[in-house]
């Protein structure tokens, strides 16, 4: 028992030392802070009505959680489709109830997407799941008498990557009989938007089958960016991001501007790490303020 306690103390001291000395801007720095960030989200959660779980395929990962707005919340023009991050391989919608709670308190219907994962799958299966999930949202809105609602497509990190592909590669939604014209706004947080500026991390290599050229293009949103984007678009990224390089959003914004896109807001979180861009549901956080103000503007358009 004494040996076990010594091992635990050693691990704790090592963790603390790394926490204090590792500089920002790398995945170790981010990983050391992830448990505390997740705990903070968990502590924010209040009792909510049970979300409706909607399957869109036979695999146990192919489902949505549908969160409905609280009864006393104001009605909104938009519904939100949200795809969470975690490197195309971790996480599940149930971990982001605090985000759903923030949206439902504002009056939004919110659909949180789960999809199959790497390494068992690659971007081809994830694209399929993204299309099927969005089609299921559209069908559910019709069933609920909510087809008049506008759709805000929203994603963080790897989830933002899938959202951007759904928006900019028309073939993705064509496979389920839809087009990107169903979207009225797009919000992307710390998103891998130009995979050419990404370091060859294991998740990226698994996603693209070791950067196979054909598969790589299927995963790279900027590859499909060919014309002006008409809908309101928000990019948020921390300039000290240690997971998805800040340059992703910088290069993507430059390309959008060069194509004539005007309804675009790019917010840089000064000193912000990867987790900061995912903190849009935390009151008082700069990301929450930026996202909240942008939502208010698009609601009033």
Residue spans for each PLM region:
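N-terminal cap/lid segment of alpha/beta-hydrolase-fold proteins
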Residues: 26-73
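Mobile cap/lid helix-loop segments that gate and shape the active-site cleft of serine hydrolases
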Residues: 43, 191-224
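Short beta-strand element of the alpha/beta-hydrolase
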Residues: 76-86
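Catalytic nucleophile-loop/oxyanion-hole region of alpha/beta-hydrolase
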Residues: 91-100, 111-150, 278-286
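Primarily recognizes the serine-hydrolase "nucleophile elbow" in alpha/beta-hydrolase
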Residues: 135-200
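Short beta-strand/loop motif that positions the catalytic acidic residue
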Residues: 228, 235-237, 241
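Conserved alpha/beta-hydrolase "acid-adjacent" motif
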Residues: 242-251
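C-terminal catalytic histidine-bearing segment of alpha/beta-hydrolase fold enzymes
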Residues: 250-301
């Amino acid at each position: 028992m004494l040996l076990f306690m010594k091992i635990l103390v050693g691990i704790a001291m090592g963790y603390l030392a790394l926490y204090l000395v590792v500089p920002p801007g790398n995945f170790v720095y981010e990983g050391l802070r992830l448990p505390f960030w997740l705990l903070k989200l968990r502590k924010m959660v209040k009792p909510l009505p049970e979300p409706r779980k909607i399957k869109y395929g036979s695999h146990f990962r192919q489902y949505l959680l549908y969160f409905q707005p609280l009864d006393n919340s104001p009605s909104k023009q938009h519904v939100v489709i949200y795809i969470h991050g975690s490197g195309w391989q971790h996480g599940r919608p149930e971990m982001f109830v605090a985000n759903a709670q923030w949206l439902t308190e504002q009056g939004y219907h919110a659909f949180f997407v789960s999809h199959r994962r790497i390494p068992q799958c690659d971007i081809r299966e994830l694209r399929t799941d993204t299309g099927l999930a969005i089609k299921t949202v559209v069908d559910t809105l019709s069933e609920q008498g909510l087809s008049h609602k506008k759709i805000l497509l929203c994603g963080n990190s790897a989830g933002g990557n899938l959202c951007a592909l759904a928006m900019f590669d028309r073939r993705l939604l064509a496979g389920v009989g839809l087009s990107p014209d169903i979207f009225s706004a797009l919000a992307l947080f710390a998103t891998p938007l130009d995979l050419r500026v990404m370091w060859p991390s294991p998740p990226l290599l698994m996603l693209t089958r070791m950067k196979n050229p054909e598969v790589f293009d299927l995963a790279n949103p900027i590859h499909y960016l060919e014309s002006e984007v008409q809908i309101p678009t928000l990019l948020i990224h921390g300039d000290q991001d240690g997971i998805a390089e800040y340059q992703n959003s910088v290069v993507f914004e430059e390309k959008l501007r060069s194509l004539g896109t005007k309804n675009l807001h790019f917010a840089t979180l000064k000193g912000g790490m990867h987790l900061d861009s995912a903190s849009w549901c935390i009151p008082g956080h700069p990301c929450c303020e930026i996202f909240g103000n942008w939502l208010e503007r698009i609601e009033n358009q």
